[in-house]
């Protein structure tokens, strides 16, 4: 893995983003922000899942008012997601949010952007410049207030970076230039509490846009694949796109966008980071895929253990194996392991047999050892 790109560090609430801070995991509420009770409940659920930053949609003034109450009832850093109307950003700052997300594709009046920047600067609140393929300004119209139609703006006719002829303007150029336009406004006002995202559904477009931006600005990058899909397809797409960038040392905070429970976004985000050894938060599960040699339902066992491990915060490696071929070896390499079969299970701790139990007792015995290991690591 390549050395991480060191960006300018900023603080989103009490979470440091960029610099040498760990890559943080964030999500977005899927409730109607105007429903305070439902939104607060979802935020608290996200916190329990390990989420470090939460973004809320702010479509109107009623949502802004609700945001103020949500802020009073929660402690996690909150980001106000703003589109179309700069006044919503100004009022969200009054509500006490920790960061703004502005879309340079649909707030393109320079004067209005400047108003928001001045207020954010006075409060030392960061701004994420969030460029999305689905809301890019018209080709030739970056920074112009006219032309909002996605059907006649020329964006869909732009070639991908890999398909463009030498010197030909590509969709990646358009994404990056849109971001740089708004970055320029912020920099002219001596505002540098900047975070940037450049999202598309297409992995090649997204990865190339982030690579280019990483080369020309010092600011932290928020990674994401937009509208990535359901829990299964979206997790795979996000793991590939985000994983490529993170492996190259690019990225300071991530959001896995899924058409699913927001907590799944958090779990998936941490799994991506743990797989690259960028975070050591929570248990890591090693499980065999099962085959004809297994005489225990490994799939059911592994999924049950995986669900139970979600509450474990220590970086424990847990192995679930179903036969004698790789089971003992893999289990011995884990902090806690189980090799099951023939109506019994061997529980391992740090490579040593801890006990042999009946199959009916293996789950409870395994989790007893996991909790003991968790307590030992937490104490250290």
Located regions from the model:
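Catalytic alpha/beta core domains of metabolic enzymes, predominantly
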Residues: 117, 128-131, 143-147, 151-313
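N-terminal active-site wall of soluble small-molecule enzyme domains
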Residues: 42, 46, 55-95
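N-terminal amphipathic alpha-helix/helix-capping segment at the start of soluble metabolic enzymes
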Residues: 1-27, 121, 307
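Alpha-helix-loop-beta-strand connector modules within alpha/beta enzyme cores
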Residues: 61-82, 115-127, 213-221, 305-307
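Conserved, mostly hydrophobic/aromatic
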Residues: 25, 81, 129, 196, ...
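Hydrophobic or amphipathic alpha-helical targeting/insertion segments
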Residues: 87-128
């Amino acid at each position: 893995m390549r050395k991480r790109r060191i960006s300018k560090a900023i603080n989103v609430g009490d979470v440091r983003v960029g610099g040498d801070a760990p890559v943080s995991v964030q999500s977005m509420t899927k409730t109607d922000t105007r429903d305070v009770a439902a939104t607060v409940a979802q935020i608290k659920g996200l916190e329990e899942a390990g989420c470090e930053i939460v973004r809320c949609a702010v479509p109107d003034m009623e949502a802004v008012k609700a945001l103020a109450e949500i802020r009073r009832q929660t402690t996690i850093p909150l980001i106000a997601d703003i589109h179309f109307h700069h006044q919503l950003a100004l009022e969200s700052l009054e509500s006490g949010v920790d960061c703004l997300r502005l879309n340079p594709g649909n707030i393109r009046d320079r004067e209005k952007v400047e108003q928001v920047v001045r207020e954010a600067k006075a409060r030392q609140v960061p701004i994420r410049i969030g460029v999305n393929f689905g809301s890019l300004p018209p080709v030739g119209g970056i920074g112009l207030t006219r032309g909002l139609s996605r059907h006649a703006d020329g964006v869909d006719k732009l070639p991908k970076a890999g398909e463009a002829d030498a010197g030909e303007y590509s969709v990646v150029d358009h994404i990056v230039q849109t971001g740089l336009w708004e970055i320029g406004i912020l920099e002219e006002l001596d505002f540098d509490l900047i975070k940037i995202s450049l999202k598309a559904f297409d992995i090649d477009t997204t990865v190339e846009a982030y690579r280019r931006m990483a080369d020309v600005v010092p600011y932290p990058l928020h990674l994401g694949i937009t509208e990535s899909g359901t829990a299964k397809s979206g997790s795979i797409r996000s793991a590939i796109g985000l994983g490529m960038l993170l492996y190259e040392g690019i990225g300071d905070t991530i959001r896995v966008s899924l058409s699913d429970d927001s907590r799944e976004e958090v779990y998936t985000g941490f799994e991506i980071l743990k797989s690259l050894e960028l975070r050591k938060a929570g248990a890591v599960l090693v499980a065999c895929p099962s085959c004809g040699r297994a005489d225990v339902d490994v799939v059911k066992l592994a999924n049950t253990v995986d669900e139970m491990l979600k509450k474990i915060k220590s970086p424990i490696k847990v192995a679930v194996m179903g036969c004698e071929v790789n089971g003992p070896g893999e289990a011995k390499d884990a902090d806690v392991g189980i090799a099951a079969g023939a109506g019994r299970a061997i529980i391992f701790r740090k490579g040593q047999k801890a006990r042999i139990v009946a199959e009916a007792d293996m789950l409870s015995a395994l989790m007893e050892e996991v909790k003991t290991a968790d307590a030992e690591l937490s104490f250290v």
